[in-house]
């Protein structure tokens, strides 16, 4: 079953996530109006969930359609569709912005992602912006995958409401897939290098510190836990390892330097350490392109 309750259940809302609400949605709130301001006000929201992108669009939004296995966007037009089957019944009118947030691109197989990109390029108009987020290959969540080639070897089970199959990506790999589809790559931006998955345990690398849980505790007014000051175990040699080790050291210094500060203040200081990288080092990797 693809469209029913059984298929949608793994992707259903997993409960309140204070880190996402406080920090990650803030970044999306900056992104969506900028995209609409640059390309136009018609937005196709791929994997729309509860319609967050539509709510964050503000006055720049002129037309909206959300696609999801089980849409929950009250008051916004949506269609129930599985993006693994392609773009779906979105009508003939092109959109100005095609947006897929929170790792949606990694929930498709490499072949399914390529098919979706081709269909987006055909549906959009010249100049339509395409902003799709994948899971970053060089995330601290899975250093054992850093040297793994794209394809079946890199496809792993990932826990949401239940296990789903995901495929992390490097930016250069996605740039090439955009080009093959007729979409000019414009840039890449990492999201959430420090906080990792919503679950506190790691299935892929036991050295992953539960930073997300530590930030959530700070936002609740609790003191900083060990996860926020611990150093990282050894990682595969290379720039991703140096970046992640340096970020952990900066986080430790920030916590020790802010001793006595309130939990939310310290959480903001830690989040401010997020570097403006685009190399696939974060939990999320956003690729921006333009239909040629």
Predicted regions and their residues:
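A short glycine-rich, Lys/Arg-flanked "PGG" loop and its adjoining helix->strand segment in the class I
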Residues: 114-129
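Conserved class I S-adenosyl-L-methionine
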Residues: 1-37, 40-49, 129-154
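A short acidic, Gly/Pro-enriched loop at the edge of an enzyme's catalytic core
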Residues: 89-98
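Short alpha-helix
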Residues: 163-183
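Class I SAM-dependent methyltransferase SAM/SAH-binding core
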Residues: 50-86
């Amino acid at each position: 079953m693809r469209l029913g309750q059984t298929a949608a259940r793994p992707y259903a809302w997993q409960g309140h996530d204070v880190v996402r609400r406080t920090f990650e949605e803030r970044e999306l709130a900056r992104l969506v109006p900028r995209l609409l301001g640059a390309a136009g006000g018609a937005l196709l929201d791929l994997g729309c969930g509860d319609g967050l992108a539509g709510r964050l669009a503000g006055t720049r939004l002129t037309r909206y359609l959300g696609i999801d296995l089980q849409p929950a966007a009250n008051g916004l037009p949506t269609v129930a569709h599985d993006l693994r089957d392609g773009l779906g019944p979105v009508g003939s009118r092109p959109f100005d912005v095609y947006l897929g947030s929170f790792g949606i691109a990694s929930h498709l197989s490499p072949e399914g992602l390529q098919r979706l990109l081709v269909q987006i390029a055909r549906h959009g108009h010249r100049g339509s912006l395409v902003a799709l987020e994948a899971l970053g290959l060089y995330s601290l969540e899975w250093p054992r995958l850093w040297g793994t080639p794209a394809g079946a070897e890199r496809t792993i089970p990932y826990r949401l409401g239940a296990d789903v199959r995901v495929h992390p990506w490097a930016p250069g790999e996605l740039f090439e897939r955009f080009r093959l589809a007729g979409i000019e790559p414009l840039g890449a931006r990492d999201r959430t290098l420090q906080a990792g998955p919503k679950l506190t345990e790691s299935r892929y690398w036991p050295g992953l510190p539960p930073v997300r849980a530590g930030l959530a505790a700070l936002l609740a007014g609790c003191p900083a836990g060990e996860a926020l000051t611990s150093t990282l175990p050894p990682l595969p040699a290379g720039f991703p390892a140096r970046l992640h080790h340096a970020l952990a050291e900066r986080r430790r210094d920030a916590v020790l330097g802010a001793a006595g500060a309130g939990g939310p203040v310290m959480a903001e200081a830690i989040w401010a350490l997020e570097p403006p990288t685009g190399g696939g080092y974060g939990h999320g990797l956003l690729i921006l392109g333009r239909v040629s």
